Structures are given as C-alpha cells and as structure tokens.
Amino acid sequence: MKKLVFGLLAIVLFGCGLYIYHVWFGDPFSKNAAEQKLVSYVKQTYPKKEIKITNGVYNAKTSEYVFEATSQSHRYPMCTKGFLHPKVTCDGIEEAYTESVAKHVNEEATKAIEADLKKAVPRFIKADAALSIENGQFTLDTKWNKKLAEKAPMSMTIQLDASGLSKTDAAKMAETVRKTLNEKGYTYSNGTIDCMQKDGDGGIGYVKYSIDFLSKAAIQSNDAEELGS
C-alpha cells in the first residue's frame, strides 16, 4: 500500500514539475509546433521573400515563443502563443512596414499642414502630424489626402514664435491656427501648440506657453499654460 501511495505521489510531483517547467521555460514539443507555425505563416504571408525562422525562446511573462525572422540581413521578432494549435501573435515584418508607412504618411501630412499655416500665421515655426495607423491600413503607395485622417486619427504638435507676447496674444495666435486648420478641412483628434520664446541668438529657446486644443473648442487665454518666462 505504501509503495502505491509513494508511486502516486511521485507521479504527481513529476507532473507538477513538468507543468512548472513548461510554464517558465516552455517545452520542445510546443517550441517545435510554434516554429512550424511560423514557417508556414511566412511562406503564405510573404511568398516572394526568403525568410528564415531561428532562435526561438520562451517568454514566461506572456506565455509566448519569440523567434527571429531573418530576411536580407534584417531581423524581425515573430511570436506565437498556444500549445497544440499555436497562433501568430506578433509579426515584426508587418510592424516594421507599418512604421515605414506611418513615417511616409506623417511626413506628407506635416508638409501640407505647414504650407497652410505658414500663409496664415506669420509667427509659425513648424508642425508635426502623427496619424495612428494600424497594420495593413495603408501602403507606401498611399498618397496623403485629408480623408486619411478620417480613417486613422491624427494628432499634431505645432510650434509658434511667442517671443515678447503675452498669454492673451499667444492664445489669439493659437486660435488663428485652430481656425485655419478647420477652414482648410483638416480632421484631427487633438493637438498641442507650443508657443516658443527665442533665445538671444534667435534660436528656439524654450516653451513659453503650452496649449492643448480640440477642433470644435475656441482657444481662450486661460487655455495657455505658462511654462517659462
């Protein structure tokens, strides 16, 4: 009887040990299934690219296997999650492409905004537009137009020269920016206007007033937060 009890206890302890090991370090069967899943995935998703899946490691925090996808000396993270039927949970190749697309679209949007604001605001310095673009939403062939911001929310940061201006004057100038953006038909979720104080050499010194704004709310003097003087 004692041998049976000790035998069952040993089996239970062994099973618990395997489970704990799997939770923290994964196991060769799951790792192989994850690797095969990624090999199949990249062949189907990127049939024209030669991609090698290597260096798989187990991430205990996310319960994922993280591999390296190597293509033309570039390395990208690829992740899977699941035991018998793993699913792809991250695609570094697609994410890198989306970052390139976002950079392209944001640069074009910024150029358009700067061109419009330079004409309307004499003390305009620069703008920086950022669209929240999801994977597969646009491509590198996508050309900027204002309707894109209806699909991908756009925020922006704008710098104005507020040297020698009071908070009230800075707010009025910022309101001109808001009105101009609206008149030109820009759609945006929110924006920040940094009213700058130039230094003694004429360079950009520091943020004198900072103003957060929305398209439908007029900017008042009390919206300007004084940061430096």
From Swiss-Prot:
Identify the domain of life. Answer: Bacteria
Q: InterPro entries given for it?
A: YfjL_C (IPR056905)
Pfam families the UniProt entry points to: YfjL_C, YfjL_N
The name of this protein is: Uncharacterized protein YfjL
Organism from which the protein derives:
Bacillus subtilis (strain 168)
Q: Which gene encodes it?
A: yfjL
